[in-house]
């Protein structure tokens, strides 16, 4: 399933490949003197971002040099035949950018795509890289709905099955300049709305009102104008049929939610470099602006375009249970990282719904991690599991209850035995004091006999 996809019925083609969604934040700021104050300002900004994400229950971790070359190397050196990520050896005496690229790496630039070639273990691999960027601002966008662009819950066929990188590059524009621009725009539109121009173009009144509200938010510091570039980079095998399927999957998935994407003919190399960390600050974002592919919107609207997926992988091991968006996830209720204070679990379902099919893998994961399991089975549903795992299956029909087992002092244990017999004698309610007293006398008499 991880290599291709889950088996499906005849005539059904759903992209049910396993996923491992990750979000990486990179930030670069111009600095002429490279002073300690600039570094301290950036460190404080990173702390604010991490604290904000932690407030939304999104855990983060800092990327060190080893993690950096592993992440960027995985983004650059894509091998469609590789199933596991490759860990690279960090050389502290060499620049990081040279350590991210394989020695056998070659890249061919085409008009409509890029071709990436590698050679590993005596075998050549070729991958095709496709890029698509946002043609215009969407009419409406919600942060909770962004994941439907690449893994739709209600329409699973509108999903992206190939590996991809979704990049959102943004720059907050100067507040004073944007405020002045909004003032000029508002004054011009308001002037036109009071003339005969408004009779020919009725929308000018609405535009004047919107620019008036925007300048108020900019003046009070409640909002900012952001220039952003949204791009998706997809990797697939180097053949035309597969590339066409990937292209249609991406365009249709985003179009479903009102996002119009286009393929940057003759500019795939530019878009591919955009997904790499810190490249936008090296003059690439200026090239994007000159090409006219950068969009503008308020900071609130751009924040709703962030590529976040609310699917948690839960635990590093346990029962494999992918989410609805095919995120690779595991269930282990005893994992300490989940901070569980109650390890009880209830499973409900009709007959034949698969309750036993869920619990059996959980039992296997507990046994594989060194634990033990005790099952009270009514219906022999766990008999084969017990035999396969080398356990001991006890038939309840041959068992007998001895309430006096392991008792050495009847004076200390008589009331406990009395309580056990009370439950057996009256399972639907408590006995009164008279009957409990008679049972206690019977327990002592039986022990002495």
Give residue ranges: language-model regions.
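Short, intrinsically disordered, charge-balanced linker/junction segments flanking boundaries
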Residues: 1, 448-449
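Glycine-rich phosphate-binding loop of nucleotide-binding enzymes
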Residues: 1, 315-396
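Extended, folded cores of ATP/NTP-driven motor/assembly subunits in large transport
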Residues: 1-302
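Generic recognition of flexible, low-complexity loop/linker segments
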Residues: 11-13, 154, 217-221, 317-319, ...
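Switch/coupling segment of Walker-type NTPase motor domains
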Residues: 14-16, 360-448
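Short, solvent-exposed loop/turn segments at the edges of secondary structure
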Residues: 18-20, 225-227, 324, 340-342, ...
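Residues in well-ordered beta-strands of folded domains
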Residues: 26-28, 167-169, 233, 319-322, ...
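Core mixed alpha/beta domains of very large multi-subunit molecular machines
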Residues: 282-328, 336
């Amino acid at each position: 399933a991880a290599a291709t996809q889950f088996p499906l019925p005849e005539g059904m083609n759903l992209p049910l490949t396993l996923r491992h969604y990750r979000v990486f934040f990179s930030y670069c700021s111009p600095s002429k003197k490279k002073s300690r104050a600039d570094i301290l300002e950036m460190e404080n900004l990173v702390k604010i971002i991490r604290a904000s994400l932690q407030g939304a229950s999104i855990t983060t971790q800092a990327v060190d040099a080893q993690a950096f070359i592993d992440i960027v190397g995985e983004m650059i050196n894509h091998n469609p035949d590789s199933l596991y990520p490759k860990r690279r050896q960090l050389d502290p005496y060499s620049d990081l950018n040279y350590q991210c690229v394989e020695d056998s790496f070659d890249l061919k630039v085409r008009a409509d795509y890029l071709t990436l070639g590698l050679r590993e273990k005596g075998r050549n691999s070729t991958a095709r890289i496709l890029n698509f960027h946002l043609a215009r601002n969407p009419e409406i966008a919600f942060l909770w709905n962004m994941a439907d662009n690449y893994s739709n819950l209600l329409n699973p066929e509108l999903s992206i099955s190939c590996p991809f990188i979704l990049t959102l590059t943004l720059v907050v524009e100067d507040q004073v300049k944007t405020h002045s621009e909004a003032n000029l725009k508002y004054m011009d539109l308001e002037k036109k709305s009071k003339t005969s121009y408004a009779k020919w173009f009725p929308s000018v009144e609405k535009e004047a009102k919107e620019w008036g509200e925007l300048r108020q938010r900019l003046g009070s510091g409640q909002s900012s104008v952001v220039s952003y570039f949204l791009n998706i980079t997809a990797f697939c095998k180097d053949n035309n049929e597969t590339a066409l399927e990937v292209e249609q999957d991406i365009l249709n998935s985003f179009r479903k939610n009102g996002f119009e994407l286009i393929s940057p003919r003759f500019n795939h190399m530019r878009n591919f470099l955009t997904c790499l960390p810190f490249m936008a600050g090296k003059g690439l974002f200026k090239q994007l602006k000159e090409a006219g592919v950068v969009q503008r919107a308020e900071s609130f609207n751009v924040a709703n375009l962030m590529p976040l997926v609310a699917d948690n992988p839960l635990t590093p091991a346990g029962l494999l249970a992918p989410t609805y968006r095919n995120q690779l996830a595991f269930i282990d209720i005893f994992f300490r990282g989940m901070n569980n204070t109650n390890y009880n679990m209830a499973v409900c379902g009709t007959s034949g719904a698969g309750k036993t099919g869920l619990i059996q893998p959980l039992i296997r994961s507990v046994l594989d991690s060194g634990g033990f399991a005790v099952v009270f089975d009514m219906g022999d549903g766990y008999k084969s599991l017990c035999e396969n795992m080398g356990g001991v299956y006890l038939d309840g029909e041959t068992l007998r209850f001895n309430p006096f087992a392991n008792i050495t002092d009847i004076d200390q244990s008589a009331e406990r035995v009395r309580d056990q017999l009370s439950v057996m004698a009256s399972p639907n309610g408590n006995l009164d004091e008279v009957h409990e007293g008679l049972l206690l006398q019977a327990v002592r008499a039986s022990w002495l006999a």
